[in-house]
Design a protein with these regions (language model features):
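Acidic/glycine-enriched connector segments
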Residues: 1-162
Length: 162
């Protein structure tokens, strides 16, 4: 299969950090789960997570749970730079490490920290996806930029508005 065909079966996630969403993690997971299930029904089998706190990690965990009963499902984790996620609170770092451990593929955009690595990671995810699932409040930042880039690339976005 060519890349254009493969991306029609890949879906990526983007969203604000937990403190910006104004909804509980439980509510977020329910809504993300519904959109992941819709994506699977629509033929998406590979999911791409940028592994940031909040939406990315919650979505990755949900994909891994579904993969237990559906071996077609794959998870790709795309990190902006090496050792990303290892400086958070113990709880988030533990979840991050566990997801990475079970991912089918881990891709690192940069060897070291840079602010531009975040946008390059987001563009890589969009460039390799046929759909974006976003938890978005309308605020400026990386999520808005990712949605704008996806629209510019004619990639459909499913927006979860908390």
């Amino acid at each position: 299969m060519h890349e254009q065909e493969l991306r029609q079966h890949r879906c990526c996630f983007t969203g604000h950090r937990p403190e910006k969403l104004n909804i509980s993690e439980e509510q977020l997971c329910v809504r993300l789960g519904l959109e992941i299930d819709r994506a699977i029904e629509d033929g998406f089998t590979t999911f791409i997570s940028g592994m940031a706190k909040g939406v990315d990690i919650c979505a990755a965990e949900l994909v891994l749970k579904r993969r237990v009963s559906d071996d077609r499902l794959k998870l790709i984790c795309v990190l902006p730079y090496e050792n990303f996620g290892l400086h958070w609170s113990a709880s988030w770092t533990s979840r991050y490490v566990e997801v990475i451990r079970h991912a089918d593929l881990v891709r690192c955009i940069s060897q070291e920290f840079s602010y531009s690595a975040y946008q390059r990671r987001n563009e890589w995810m969009v460039d390799h996806s046929g759909r974006v699932i976003a938890a978005y409040t309308g605020e400026s930042g990386g999520t808005r930029n990712t949605i704008a880039y996806a629209k510019q690339q004619h990639i459909p976005c499913v927006i979860i508005t908390p």
